[in-house]
Amino acid sequence: MSAIVLNEKMEKASELALPESFSGINPHNLYLYVKSAQAAMRANSASALTRAEVRGGGKKPWAQKGGGRARAGSRRSPVFVGGGKAFGPKNNRNYDLKVNKKQKKLALNFALNEHAQKGSLFIVDSIEIASGKTKDAATLFKALNQRDTLFVKTVLDEKTYLAFENIASTYVIEENELNAYLAANYRSLVIEKAVWENLVGEAK
């Protein structure tokens, strides 16, 4: 598998072979990381009151016998409107899933290898919009001729960030923000050469 090296005009200049360590990775590593990332994003805000937490209803609503109705001990029972919820959600649940460092790295390498197979992994010398204008970023993105693209810079400067901010199908991040979830979530990746060299170095 190879990554496509682009020139300043976003045209193909050459190809760069991926290290052997990027191939033969179990896809389950990516599954575990994505599941962990999605679990971390859960708001965990749903919470219902149990019969012990609902206010009022301490008095027995009617006599045990003689009324012809089913016996009831409290208006807080789940069978009544306004009563507590049986087996309802609580916001004290921990959804975190642990993924170790090795699995995180394998997941990212697998995602990069998948992009290389699809021809959607691109390497450039630099990603920089010095003017800070969205128009210039859009021109660069249009020349790339890709959809839903993740740009990865060594260090993200403010002007480049602002230039891409209003282009809905792009996202620019720094090297330390790159992870398997983001890599798998975009149709194509454009990575600065310095970032790519670091990724390859860590894979050895």
UniProtKB/Swiss-Prot annotation:
Gene3D superfamilies: 3.40.1370.10. GO terms for biological process: translation. Residues 52-76 are annotated as: Disordered. InterPro entries: Ribosomal_uL4 (IPR002136), Ribosomal_uL4-like (IPR013005), Ribosomal_uL4_dom_sf (IPR023574). The keyword Nucleotide-binding does not apply. GO terms for molecular function: rRNA binding; structural constituent of ribosome. GO terms for cellular component: ribonucleoprotein complex; ribosome. It comes from the Bacteria. The keyword Ion transport does not apply. NCBIfam families: rplD_bact. Part of the 50S ribosomal subunit. One of the primary rRNA binding proteins, this protein initially binds near the 5'-end of the 23S rRNA. It is important during the early stages of 50S assembly. It makes multiple contacts with different domains of the 23S rRNA in the assembled 50S subunit and ribosome. Forms part of the polypeptide exit tunnel. This is Large ribosomal subunit protein uL4.
